[in-house]
C-alpha cells in the first residue's frame, strides 16, 4: 500500500468541485476499496465465490469509502475509477493476496 499515493479526481459535471486530490490515508483507503471491489467481482465472475460473498465484499468497499474517505459520493466514485484505471488487473489481484488482511485492519468498518 503506497500511503503516499496521490489521486486527483476530475468531475467535469460539477466545475465547482472540479478536482479532488486524495493522499495519505485516504489514498490508501481508496486503493483498498478498489482492491476489494475488483477482487469480489472477479471471483464471483469465475464462480469462485457466490453472490452473497460478493455482496459482502462490495458492502465492505462501500463502508471503507464512507468511513475513511472524505468528499461526496461522486468524488469518491471518480477517484475510485482513477485508481482502477491506474492499476493493472494482475497487480490488483496481487495486492489482494498480499494486503487484504492489512487493509481491513487499517480501515475498520465496525
Model feature map: region roles:
Residues 51-110:
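Compact alpha-helical subdomains of small soluble proteins
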Residues 2-10:
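Bacterial N-terminal signal peptides
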Residues 13-15:
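N-terminal signal peptide c-region/cleavage motif recognized by signal peptidases
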Amino acid at each position: 500500500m503506497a500511503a503516499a499515493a496521490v489521486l486527483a479526481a476530475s468531475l467535469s459535471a460539477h466545475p465547482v468541485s472540479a478536482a479532488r486530490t486524495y493522499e495519505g490515508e485516504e489514498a490508501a483507503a481508496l486503493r483498498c476499496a478498489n482492491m476489494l471491489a475488483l477482487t469480489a467481482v472477479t471471483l464471483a465472475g469465475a464462480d469462485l465465490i457466490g453472490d452473497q460473498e460478493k455482496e459482502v465484499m462490495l458492502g465492505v468497499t462501500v463502508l471503507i469509502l464512507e468511513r475513511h474517505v472524505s468528499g461526496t459520493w461522486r468524488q469518491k466514485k471518480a477517484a475510485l475509477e482513477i485508481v482502477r484505471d491506474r492499476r493493472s488487473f494482475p497487480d490488483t489481484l496481487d495486492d489482494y493476496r498480499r494486503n487484504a488482511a492489512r487493509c481491513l485492519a487499517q480501515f475498520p468498518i465496525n
